[in-house]
Amino acid sequence: MIIKPKIRGFICTTTHPVGCEANVQEQITLTKAKGKIANGPKRVLVVGSSSGYGLSSRIAAAFGSDAATIGVFFEKPGTETKPGTAGWYNSAAFDKFAKAEGLYSKSINCDAFSHEAKQKVIELIKQDLGEIDMVVYSLASPVRKLPDSGELIRSALKPIGETYTATAVDTNKDCIIEATVEPATEQEIADTVTVMGGEDWELWIKALSEAGVLADNCKTVAYSYIGTELTWPIYWHGALGKAKMDLDRAAKALNEQLSATGGSANVAVLKSVVTQASSAIPVMPLYIAMVFKKMRQEGLHEGCMEQIYRMFSERLFRADGAKPETDSDNRIRLDDWELREDIQQHCRNLWPQVTTENLSELTDYREYKAEFIKLFGFGIEGIDYDADVNPYVEFDVIEL
């Protein structure tokens, strides 16, 4: 079939398998060009490995450090008549490229919050790898099914305390609007912490640890975003921020546990990037379009892959073997360039000036749109989008 982009809200409902494969190839090429990570991990589990920072982590481990990887994700395969999710095609492409280089690659398509997922991963590790030396936790899900009761809990992207009103961009109509978001209830805040906080990360490490499959010196990292006052009402000071603070709590507890065997647990605070997750957060697309333009001008721009490669090579797995630099809360900070005062001041000054008419001139909004559509495999140079393509792509994946 011939597949064209169809956008609904902040999701593109179609995906292009060849385009998704090209995205993965591009990240692999970038990783290889940067060179091998001297003290990199060798047996890595990535929970949430099909897109965004999780996918880049799997690529950094495999193609930057020759690591065996297990990826866990929840994606939909395509059929003969309907495309699957981008994450399915990303994972299929990763598996193909990893195997072509003789690297161990196993993927599990399942609910990562479930007990079954954890048991299956443990079984695989015992069978094939013995133990693992890194666990990346990179889940971004709006809903969590509690593993014991089966109850479905939903997260809320809302402020706390008062209604939040701010200038934003309507990405469907490409115009500047005033976005208003009502505050979260106490229940919504608690639910957001349940879905997006640190509990499941702890459950993963507990299960792996009790099964005896964590190597001494095993490192685990979970990803977070803090941002600045421009996005704080909806993010760090909102329901989502409470969940990310719970991630900090979990990191502290896990670090105490893992340090006994020379391991570590950290939250890595990353920069804002165009992902399916960030596009769903009010105000983020406009902020990203603004900050990207300034960072590009300053020569500081990083996408998911550049950011993760820097985390691996300059923080977690330094050539000199030293421990990573952390902030007062033991977080690894990779938002350091984005938070530079000149860059943030630029955004603060620009925010009130942006109109529908000057949006593309003052910000990198056009590039934002191009990167967004690229997440789904579209708008990539060298791909013939009028060519017939088969949306049914099979690969070595365990379905639970």
From Swiss-Prot:
Chain sites annotated for binding substrate: 225
Active-site residues per Swiss-Prot or TrEMBL entry: 235
Pathway linked to the protein: Lipid metabolism; fatty acid biosynthesis
Listed EC numbers: 1.3.1.9
Record site: Plays an important role in discriminating NADH against NADPH: 75
Ligand binding (NAD(+)): 48-53, 74-75, 111-112, 139-140, 244, 273-275
InterPro entries per the UniProt record, alphabetical: Eno_Rdtase_FAD-bd_dom, Enoyl-CoA_Rdtase_cat_dom, FabV-like_NADH_b, Trans-2-enoyl-CoA_reductase
GO biological process: one example: fatty acid biosynthetic process
Entry keyword set: Fatty acid biosynthesis, Fatty acid metabolism, Lipid biosynthesis, Lipid metabolism, NAD, Oxidoreductase
GO molecular function annotations of the record: enoyl-[acyl-carrier-protein] reductase (NADH) activity; NAD binding; trans-2-enoyl-CoA reductase (NADH) activity
Catalytic activity from the UniProt record: a 2,3-saturated acyl-[ACP] + NAD(+) = a (2E)-enoyl-[ACP] + NADH + H(+)
Protein origin, superkingdom: Bacteria
Disulphide bonds in the chain: none
Family classification: Belongs to the TER reductase family.
Protein role: Involved in the final reduction of the elongation cycle of fatty acid synthesis (FAS II). Catalyzes the reduction of a carbon-carbon double bond in an enoyl moiety that is covalently linked to an acyl carrier protein (ACP).
The protein's assembly and partners: Monomer.
Record's protein name: Enoyl-[acyl-carrier-protein] reductase [NADH]
